[in-house]
Amino acid sequence: MKVKKMLAVFMSVLSLAACTLPFSGCGKIIGNASDKDAKSGVVRNLTENISKNDSGSKAADKEFKAAAASFSADLFKYNYSNGKTTLVSPLSMLTALALVQNGAEGETLVQLERALGGLDRDALNKYMRAYCDFLSAGDELKIANSVWTDSSVEAKQAFLQKAVDSYSAQIFSAPLSSKKTVSSINSWVKKNTDGMIPKITENADRDAVMMLINAVAFEAKWETPYTNDDIEKLEFNSYSGKSKKTEFMCSTESVYLSDGDAVGFMKPYKNGRFAFAALLPDEDVNIDDYIASLSGEKLMKIFSSAKKNEEVDVKMPKFKAEYSTQLIDTLKKMGIEDAFDRKSADFSSLIDKNDGAYIGTVMHKTFIEVDQEGTRAAAATLVGISKMSMPAINPVCLNRPFVYMIVDTETNLPLFIGVQTEI
């Protein structure tokens, strides 16, 4: 009788499932652990067995920015549920899905490539290698990837080689149904999110055969920190209609955002490499309708048309949010269907196609804390398997539901995008 198996990936965590006998297939493979290791819960680090090759990289250009912006907008708006505080990391999810598509073929690959902005996987691998290296060159942002294979599994080396070459992934072999392995995975996640996400998975899964995990950790101080004199207590009017008095941080910023339906600002972090951006829909624009209207093109236009050196009187609440979600329904809305169907999914470049691997889980966890010192944010994905006259100061008081982002100021791409509906 065939046994149902699962692959898990991302922090985003993505879980692949499979109707499978022990793995085999074409191409060179990584060998199994011993029965003794499997029974004892030993985690073997196989990374040193795979030398990292220079597979090439490509700096972010107009094509990549358009693809990444489109993916970011779709991921956010399709995951948002009316009135619910939401926070996703397009960077974490894009990295995780780009990693897993290296194991896909046929229509499964076509759907993944289309959802990831239309770039073919070889091009995306090169873009992601350069982009992640670029983002993590400073001290503010850390990106980590890992592939965990079950001790009973022989994974194709071509897939693992790409994981190491393009994503600097660590490769582990362990009995994934063991509680000790779950503890090891959570320890890896906690370490690589600086403790902001202590766990990505709660229970051992006896059907799991592989987990691909991405972790992102961001921490930066404001370029101009707030002082105690900048703190004011104001009312925040939540989505539910309730009002709550909370601490607002008051400042004058110099980048004004406007798209006809919302106004906002950008506030730089120290060194100017990243910025916090917020958009407040006009009084007559419903937050749900505004989020539904977002697209990659609209996001790029908001930032490309930003009015610099235009004063903005900003009042922003301190806030903290934790978010956890399964993203399969969201990804289906984005056009990825076959990957989640045990009969249609084709992950034959990950394992033998006859093993019937499919994605069974996509777990995404995020965290953010914004205060007068700066911002801390983290994400984990597990996939199983202009010259102007002096204007009046523009007021932007975030005293009702608003959209916010942490933005890479070089590409204007959001690393995190969320909506705060309650305080």
Predicted regions and their residues:
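N-terminal secretory signal peptides that target proteins for export/translocation
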Residues: 1-3
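Catalytic and substrate-binding regions of extracellular carbohydrate-active enzymes
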Residues: 295
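Extracytoplasmic/secreted cell-surface and envelope-processing proteins
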Residues: 106-112, 285-288, 323-325, 378, ...
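Short, positively charged
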Residues: 65-75, 375-394
